Amino acid sequence: MLTLNYIDPIAFELGPISVRWYGIIIAAGILLGYFIAQASVKKIGYDQDTLVDIIFWSAIFGFIVARIYFVIFQWPYYIQNPIEIPMIWHGGIAIHGGLIGGFVTGIIICKQKNINPFQIGDVIAPSMILGQGIGRWGNFMNHEAHGGPISRSVLENLHIPNFIIDNMYIDGKYYQPTFLYESLWDILGFVILILLRKHLRVGDTFCLYLIWYSIGRFFVEGMRTDSLMLTSDIRVAQLMSIILILIGVIIMIIRRVKYRSPRYKDVGPLSWPNPKVK
């Protein structure tokens, strides 16, 4: 008889409070991303408090908007179960909502502090995509965000570790570990952004982040069974991915042709807005 090593979504309990792996992993991704960004921001010459403010407030409002975004597209359920709306520890946050909330918050702080949002975006972009890659393991622990049914033999032929295969056995069926596909794509994106950043112009790394992440998300989303749907045929995440790819490409072209942005490695802190460099 096959024995499955099933992981409990609850890491430990503190009295009446159940602490889930989901929250621990999300927090770990944010912290690791912060330390990586901290090393980058030192090289440019920004004050450390600036980075703390941007990451802290962007994370806070990012989570809030991510939850609101998710609830809006699942409104028929939450109108019947309003008490569950704040229960983010059960899962149910949408990364695209988080990106919207985080980006808007970051831009506001950059404006207030008179610093260049594209330069800060270049600093934070590798940390963001790494954090997203780590965060997908929170979905794994919650046994969510998976693909359609698949046989165990197919998963074994993909040389996926047994502990992952075992935990893809949900309600009597094995499922595609789409969390893993997206996580690996994001981690590869982190490596690429780190290696290329010093050779790119200010703003390019952030734009490449939008493009790289969105390409991967578009294809992975097509395999998922729990997608937020705009209509019966249109997945919200795929539509948002297309929009972000276009935004990334357009901004990169405009900043290269119209503004001739300086190279990332050649400048110190830039003010808002980015000065033209011929």
UniProtKB/Swiss-Prot annotation:
What job does the chain carry out? Catalyzes the transfer of the diacylglyceryl group from phosphatidylglycerol to the sulfhydryl group of the N-terminal cysteine of a prolipoprotein, the first step in the formation of mature lipoproteins.
- What PANTHER family does the record point to? PHOSPHATIDYLGLYCEROL--PROLIPOPROTEIN DIACYLGLYCERYL TRANSFERASE (PTHR30589:SF0), PROLIPOPROTEIN DIACYLGLYCERYL TRANSFERASE (PTHR30589)
Q: In which pathway does it act?
A: Protein modification; lipoprotein biosynthesis (diacylglyceryl transfer)
Q: One cellular component GO annotation, for this chain's record?
A: plasma membrane
**Protein localization:** Cell membrane
Provide the primary localization. membrane
Which HAMAP family does this entry report, sorted A to Z? Answer: Lgt
Q: What is its EC number?
A: 2.5.1.145
Q: Which residues cross the membrane?
A: 21-41, 54-74, 88-108, 176-196, 234-254
Protein name, UniProt field: Phosphatidylglycerol--prolipoprotein diacylglyceryl transferase
- According to its record, how does it sit in the membrane? Multi-pass membrane protein
Say which family it is in: Belongs to the Lgt family.
- What is the uppermost EC class here? transferase
One GO biological process term: lipoprotein biosynthetic process
Query: Which keywords annotate this record?
Result: Cell membrane, Membrane, Transferase, Transmembrane, Transmembrane helix
Recorded superkingdom: Bacteria
Q: What InterPro entries does this protein map onto? A: Lgt
- Tell me which Pfam families the record gives: LGT
Q: Answer yes or no on keyword Chaperone.
A: no
The cross-references to NCBIfam families, in alphabetical order and at most eight, read: lgt
What GO molecular-function term can you cite, just one?
phosphatidylglycerol-prolipoprotein diacylglyceryl transferase activity
Which sites bind a 1,2-diacyl-sn-glycero-3-phospho-(1'-sn-glycerol)? 136
